[in-house]
Amino acid sequence: IARIYLLQKVLNADNAFFTPKIAKLIEVADTGELETFLKFLILLPKPANFKAVAVDALRTNVSTVFNALAYNNPYPSQFFEDSQWNQMFLKTAFMQGDLSAIQAIDKRANKDLARIISDYAHERWAAGREIDPFFWRPVTNFINASLLKDMQRLLNSSNNLENKAAALCCYYSIKPDAKDLLKDHHILVQQIENNELTWETLKEK
C-alpha cells in the first residue's frame, strides 16, 4: 500500500514524466510487487495510462498475478475493450477460477461472449465434462435460438445448480422466449422473486 501511495504522489506531481518510468519499473517488478500494482491500479491518477500493463497481465501463466487483475478489481470493467474483458472472463473459466469474483459481469456481457460461452459449453458436454453454472451469467440478455436450447437443457438437467443458473438467466433476460421457458418451473421463479435465489447465493447449500 505504501508503494501505491508513493506512486500516487509522483504521478500527481508530474504524470507525463513519471508514467513511462513507472511502466518500465513494472516490467522488472517481482511477482508480489506486480500483484499489488494490479490490485490497486484503479487508485492511480489517470489509470487508463497503464492499460497496457493490465492487458499484458491477461497473458501471464502465474495464477496469483492473473487473479490480482481479475478478482474483485474494478479496473477491467472500466477500461478493457470487449475482446479483452471476454479474454479475462474466459481464461478465468478455463483456469477453473472463481467467476463470481469478477466485477460488473452483467454490465460487460456482450453478444460475442454469449456465443463463445455456448460453443464452449457444447464442447464440454461432448467431452462429458461439467461446466461451472456461473459461467452462464453473461448470456442473460443474448439468448438466441441456440442459447434457448442450452437453457432448456440446463432446466431439464439433473444438476440442481444448472437448473438454478438457467432460471436466473431466463428470469432476468430481456428476451420473452427465454422467460417463457420458466412457465413450468414455478418453484425456481418463486425462489428468485423471494430473493432466495440470486447469482450471489447460487452455490449456497
What are these regions (language model features)?
Residues 1-205:
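Alpha-helical scaffold domains
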